[in-house]
């Protein structure tokens, strides 16, 4: 009984990453049309909140490692120090994620393969939404998506997730259920990549718990 009381009275930290990822997943559920039908605004929620959840995951794991006792594996101390330094230096989410992967798994994340490529593409899309630039001039019935949105079309050509209809608005093209699903899958895969292959430690237990939340959300929607 004393052990139970000790656990009950022990300070705990509520982790937000899973909850935020749930927001991205819930936004998928409300889209009831064909996967590549454009103009589904909830898809933008999935794009933005999937990345927010990923950044929350990185920040919370850094803070969690920093609050651990010194009686931990050396890699936990290295993770806490280097990830904390990267955050103080305002390093990009891309860099911090690759740094976390290297420290925890002992392997560099392959930037030329999945899941990194989709992750990088997603970060770029989120940034384009947050820092939206004007659309190009568009003549209805004449201008094609390739002409009006050449950069977007080139980046996503092989994904087959953009809206299939022509549109003067580039954001209309990414407002599809297919884009929303791809965003959440990409984040869940990169979280799994970071959490897999870590050594046994208290940090690893937390990583496993958080990873299971992300993967269970994915399993529940697909």
Language model segments and positions:
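Amphipathic alpha-helix face/heptad-repeat signature
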Residues: 13, 20, 50, 115-118, ...
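Amphipathic, Lys/Arg-enriched alpha-helical patches that create a basic surface
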Residues: 24-27, 121-128, 141-221
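Short, hydrophobic, well-ordered secondary-structure elements
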Residues: 40-65
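Secondary-structure edge/capping motif, primarily at the C-terminal ends of alpha-helices
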Residues: 27-36, 65, 133-136, 194
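Charged alpha-helical initiation segments
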Residues: 1-44, 48, 212-221
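Alpha-helical repeat scaffolds in large eukaryotic proteins
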Residues: 29-32, 55, 62, 188
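Flexible secondary-structure boundary motifs
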Residues: 66-162, 166
């Amino acid at each position: 009984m004393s052990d139970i009381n000790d656990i009950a009275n022990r300070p705990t930290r509520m982790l937000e990453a899973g909850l935020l990822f749930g927001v991205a997943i819930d936004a998928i559920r409300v889209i009831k049309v064909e996967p590549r039908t454009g103009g589904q605004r909830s898809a933008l929620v999935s794009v933005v909140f999937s990345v927010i959840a990923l950044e929350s995951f990185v920040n919370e794991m850094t803070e969690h490692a920093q609050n651990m006792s010194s009686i931990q594996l050396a890699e936990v101390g290295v993770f806490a120090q280097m990830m904390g330094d990267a955050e103080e230096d305002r390093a990009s989410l891309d860099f911090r994620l690759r740094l976390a992967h290297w420290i925890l798994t002992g392997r560099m994340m392959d930037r030329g393969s999945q899941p990194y490529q989709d992750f990088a593409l997603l970060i770029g899309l989120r940034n384009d939404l947050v820092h939206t630039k004007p659309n190009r001039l568009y003549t209805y019935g004449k201008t094609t998506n390739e002409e009006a949105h050449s950069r977007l079309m080139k980046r996503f050509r092989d994904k087959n997730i953009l809206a299939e209809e022509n549109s003067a608005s580039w954001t209309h093209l990414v407002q599809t259920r297919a884009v929303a699903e791809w965003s959440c899958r990409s984040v869940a895969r990169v979280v799994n990549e970071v959490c897999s292959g870590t050594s046994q430690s208290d940090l690893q237990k937390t990583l496993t718990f958080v990873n299971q939340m992300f993967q269970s959300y994915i399993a529940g929607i697909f």
